């Protein structure tokens, strides 16, 4: 599932998302070969590596151009979104990226491919990646933070968030507000064991296995497949409908809730 984590500077959102490479599962051979071919074509396959068993974790700089992100140039080289195929594209300080770059992500997020055109020739590269974004709540980073003063005008905050247009955010299932880290309590160590890298990796492996058996990732379930794999009883349907009205969820938002619920159930082996 695509994710946007936003919160004040120093709250740990970027550090947490940079842990994702350790959670990535091994790929089936067909997907491994696809990832390997793309990196070989881009000249980024290490000489000592014959095949990449995991998807890549790509972290482009905020100054990256559309060509750098999507690909192109004289030889139509694959860009960051194709290098992140079957892996993760992480945009740290996402609001600092050009608006045009962020908007270009919409089509590959929907289709899983990117079409590059050069001198009357078109090249289609795979671009089925998980998008992770980290952002501050406003340009100065203090908006809504207890004990801090936000120096931004209402207009500047509005323009800041306009970079994340509705169509882009519609394709981001998870939007998480991250609070500043508080001092650990005595019980935190025991609780954190359930969320250690090793424990999470095992849960992810279970979820990935279930999704491969279905033949599709939960994030890409169609409306018909949601009905098939995310069936609800009457009580659950009433609860979801109440939440839809309470939070003014669109149909896409309701679908995202069901997909996420299916993933959580998969991780718990239900």
Regions found by a protein language model. Give the residues of each.
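Conserved alpha-helical scaffold flanking the Walker A/P-loop in AAA+ ATPase domains
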Residues: 50-51, 55-56, 61-89, 122
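Residues immediately C-terminal
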Residues: 89-90, 96-97, 183
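Short flexible coil/turn linkers enriched for glycine and charged/polar residues
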Residues: 1, 11-14, 63, 75, ...
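Walker A/P-loop
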Residues: 3-46, 111
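Walker B catalytic acidic pair
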Residues: 86, 92-94, 104
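Basic, amphipathic alpha-helical bundle interface domains used for macromolecular binding and assembly
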Residues: 75-76, 99-270
């Amino acid at each position: 599932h695509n994710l946007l984590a936003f919160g004040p500077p120093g709250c740990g959102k970027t550090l947490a998302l940079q842990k994702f490479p350790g959670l990535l599962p091994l790929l089936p051979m067909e997907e491994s070969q696809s990832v390997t071919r793309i990196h070989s074509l881009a000249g980024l396959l290490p000489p000592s590596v014959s095949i990449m068993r995991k998807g890549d974790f790509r972290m482009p700089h905020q100054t990256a151009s559309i060509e750098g992100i999507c690909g192109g140039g004289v030889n139509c080289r694959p860009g960051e979104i194709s290098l992140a195929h079957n892996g993760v594209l992480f945009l740290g300080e996402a609001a600092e990226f050009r608006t045009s770059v962020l908007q270009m992500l919409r089509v590959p997020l929907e289709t899983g491919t990117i079409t590059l055109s050069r001198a009357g020739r078109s090249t289609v590269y795979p671009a089925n990646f998980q998008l992770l974004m980290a952002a501050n709540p406003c340009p100065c980073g203090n908006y809504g933070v207890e004990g801090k003063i936000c120096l931004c005008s209402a207009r500047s905050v509005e323009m800041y968030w306009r970079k994340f247009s509705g169509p882009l955010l519609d394709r981001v299932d998870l939007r998480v507000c991250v609070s500043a880290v508080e001092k650990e309590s005595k019980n935190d160590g025991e609780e954190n064991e359930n969320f250690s890298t090793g424990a999470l990796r095992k849960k992810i492996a279970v979820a990935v296995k279930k999704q491969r058996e279905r033949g599709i990732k939960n994030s890409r379930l169609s409306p018909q497949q949601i009905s098939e794999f995310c069936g609800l009883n009457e009580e659950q349907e009433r609860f979801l409908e109440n939440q839809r009205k309470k939070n003014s969820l669109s149909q896409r938002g309701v679908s995202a809730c069901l997909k996420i619920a299916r993933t959580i159930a998969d991780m718990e082996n239900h």
